[in-house]
Amino acid sequence: SQLVKANGWIEGLTIASIILGVLLGGQLVGHHLSAALLSIDIPMIDFGIHTAAEAAIAALILVYALAAWFNTRIPHTGVEMRPLRQHPQRSILASTLALLPDFWACNSRLWHDKLGQISLSTTTLFWGAGGNLKFIVLAWAGVALGYNTTQASALTGVVAIGTAVGAVAASMRMRLDMATRVIPLGIAMGLLLILMVFISNIWLAIPFLILLGGLGGFLVVPMNALLQHRGHNLMGAGRSIAVQNFNEQACILGLGAFYSLSLKLGLSVFGAITVFGMVVAGIMLVIQRWHASNCRNHSEELDHLLHIARQDTHH
């Protein structure tokens, strides 16, 4: 499926950019790179940059400027945009609040779809876990390997390598109607997080983190493609992406709060990672059983939805 292949690129690059951002941030505040940035001197111009943090922020401003330039190169699709303010006499806030009923209706519609609910719950959990994985790796590396922030941030780049490999592999091997077969990989991800507490050697940690990232990349690409397919058919791509992003960001905040609370309640880093891994594996097991129940009780509806996915010639 072309949609799965496209998601291989999109998801792989998105996850890689998030994790590599942590890698870049760790290096920017490190002694060597920050010293090199502070040594840059342009005659007759004083930028007022005197600390490592200020130099790091200045470097990120350049990254944002580059990203903004990339956005200007996105071709116009010709789709007519829906105006935010349908009634000019209303304020922007009032116009935004007026869209909420439509948003919640779309959210409910996707959660009640027999394939949409499985793909949305899987991608939501993945992003919730992946969004907090960088903090887990930093904390684990500090305790298990004795690394400082700069050294530990380099390990997050290792996860990005695995994610990219997994995403590419999924785009080559998976089809849209096969997406639900990757659910067990989510359970494996949670169990691998638990096994992380037993690793204290860097040469064992590197292939382990590559494997962890690879499972994530292979999991999220077909599931995200299936979610976009169902969302496009149910409500259109724009609303579907809005629903997806809302649920994923909420999960990132929720799991992040759960991990932080575990540490605050006195759990060690290893204990918090173990509990976090158990939660991820447990929720994925529930999703697996949920899909199995749908297959038993709504087999005709699922067969029809999968037939639509197989016939999706637009992607």
Q: Predicted regions: what is each one?
A:
Residues 1-30, 118, 126-134, 159, ...:
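Substrate-agnostic recognition of the 12-TM MFS/MFS-like secondary transporter fold
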Residues 88, 230, 289-315:
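Intrinsic disorder in cytosolic terminal tails and internal cytosolic loops
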Residues 29, 165-179, 263:
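Helix-to-loop junctions at the C-terminal end of transmembrane segments
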Residues 187-201:
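C-terminal ends and interior cores of transmembrane alpha-helices
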Residues 172-189, 237:
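Cytoplasmic membrane-interface "Motif A"-like loop-to-helix N-cap segments
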